[in-house]
Structure formats: structure tokens, C-alpha cells
A protein has these predicted regions:
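A short N-terminal helical cap/helix-turn-helix that marks the beginning
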Residues: 2-23, 42
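Conserved pre-ATP/AMP-binding loop-to-beta segment of ANL
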Residues: 19-22, 152-171, 178, 201-207
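Conserved AMP-binding/adenylate-forming core of the ANL superfamily
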Residues: 23-69, 73, 77, 94-99, ...
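Conserved AMP-binding A3 loop
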Residues: 34-38, 167-193
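Conserved structural elements of the adenylate-forming
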Residues: 41-46, 182-203, 208-211, 221
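A short helix-loop-beta submotif of the ANL/AMP-binding
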Residues: 61, 67-87, 91-95, 103-109, ...
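Conserved ATP-dependent adenylate/AMP-binding module captured primarily in the ANL superfamily
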Residues: 91-122, 192-209
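ANL superfamily adenylate-forming
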Residues: 116-163
Length: 226
């Protein structure tokens, strides 16, 4: 079986080869918050260490519920760096669907961020679940991203050694019934990105506008490191 670079391989390569180049840019309150590859890498690696310090690790499921934002990408990467499995959710799901996914996936924590109607959606999150809030969109009764990473040293190197390990569970939107989860390993995601990039040449410094929800498998793969 052919080997393809995983998204973590690609992220680490960009982090090392172009640390000072812009990776993510997000409009917040009338201005832009920018993150270079190095800056994002530090946040990702420190949050991974924070997740490990909370007792989360290999194959533990961690959910993300937020509209598109820079910290969505960083949270998803941090989950992988911590050895956990990402469970992204559509940011317009009903509380019942949110609860169903969290229970079905056996999620042990959730990143809760930029949302319309956050109070209503929070009703779908079990009270005993660990909730981490994104900067710029911090909700009440959540653990603060910045506070969590402040006390951590970044994890080192590339933690993904097994490309066949489970990377993420992508659930359907639930519009035609209960959401259904599809399991993707690192190899499958790397294969898809590689084949896509074979058809689009000379992409190096173009600006990519993220429009589709990041919980959509194509958007998630290509925005992160495609």
C-alpha cells in the first residue's frame, strides 16, 4: 500500500519550512486576527499538552462545535497532536442531535466556540462533559483556551506514527434522520488530499476563503494543510 503524507505530516512540514508565513486570518470585531504557521503551531502543541494534562489521550473522542474560525482549525489539529480523535459537528444542529452525537461517539470533551444561538445549542451538551471555549467567543461555564495553554509546554515532534489510526469521525447533518458517523483514518485523508492536489498545480501562496462548514470532510482536509 502506498504511503501518503498525513495532514499532521503536512502541518509539521509547513511549520518548519515557512514558520513566519501567514497560515490563518480571521475577522474579529472589525479587525483581523492573524496567525503564522509558527504561532498556530505553538497554540496547537500547547493545547495538545493541555488535553493530555486533563487525562485525554489515545483514541479518546473530542468534539468541536463552532462556526468556521481560526481556533476551529487549531483545535482540530491539537486533538490529533494529543492522540485523540476529532468529532466535528455542524454549527446549526439541534440540541437533540448534538446530544445524540456526543453520546454515540462517547466524546469526553468538546470545544465550544463561535455560534448563533449558543445558549440553545449548549442544552445538548451534557453537564458532566468538559467544555473548552475559544478565544473571542468565550461562553459562560467553559474552560478558557488561553488559560489552558498558558501553563503548558508544547508537545514536540510529529505524534502520528500510525497512518491507519483513526483520525476523525465525520457525522452527517441529521436533516434526514439521526446523524450517522463515518470513520476516517489518517491514511484515507492523506490519500484524498494527495489525489486532489494532483489535479491543481502551482498552489503555494494563494489565499483560500473558507466558506463550507469545517465539519464538512472536504473543507476540513483542504483548509488544514491541502
Amino acid at each position: 500500500m502506498a504511503n501518503y503524507p498525513t495532514l499532521i505530516d503536512k502541518f509539521c512540514a509547513f511549520e518548519q519550512s515557512q514558520p513566519d508565513q501567514l497560515f490563518l486570518s480571521e475577522p474579529v470585531a472589525g479587525s483581523y486576527k492573524n496567525f503564522t504557521w509558527a504561532e498556530a503551531g505553538q497554540q496547537v502543541r500547547k493545547m495538545a499538552a493541555a488535553l493530555n494534562a486533563m487525562g485525554l489521550g489515545k483514541d479518546d473522542k473530542v468534539a468541536i462545535l463552532s462556526k468556521n474560525c481560526a481556533h476551529w482549525i487549531m483545535a482540530d489539529l491539537a486533538i490529533s497532536f494529543a492522540g485523540c480523535v476529532s468529532v466535528p459537528m455542524y454549527p446549526n444542529m439541534t440540541p437533540d442531535s448534538i446530544q445524540q452525537i456526543l453520546e454515540h461517539s462517547e466524546a469526553k470533551a468538546i470545544f465550544f466556540g463561535k455560534l448563533d444561538g449558543a445558549d440553545q445549542m449548549r442544552k445538548g451538551v451534557p453537564e458532566n462533559l468538559m467544555v473548552i471555549g475559544f478565544p473571542f467567543y468565550l461562553e459562560k461555564n467553559t474552560q478558557n483556551w488561553d488559560d489552558l495553554i498558558a501553563a503548558q509546554q508544547p508537545v514536540q515532534g510529529n505524534p502520528v506514527k500510525d497512518s491507519m489510526a483513526l483520525a476523525t469521525i465525520i457525522y452527517t447533518s441529521g436533516t434526514t434522520g439521526q446523524p450517522k458517523g463515518v470513520m476516517h483514518n489518517f491514511h484515507a485523508v492523506g490519500f484524498a488530499v494527495d489525489k486532489f492536489l494532483n489535479h491543481i498545480h502551482q498552489i503555494k501562496k494563494e489565499i483560500f476563503f473558507s466558506y463550507l462548514p469545517l465539519c464538512h470532510v472536504a473543507e476540513k482536509m483542504l483548509v488544514k494543510c491541502g
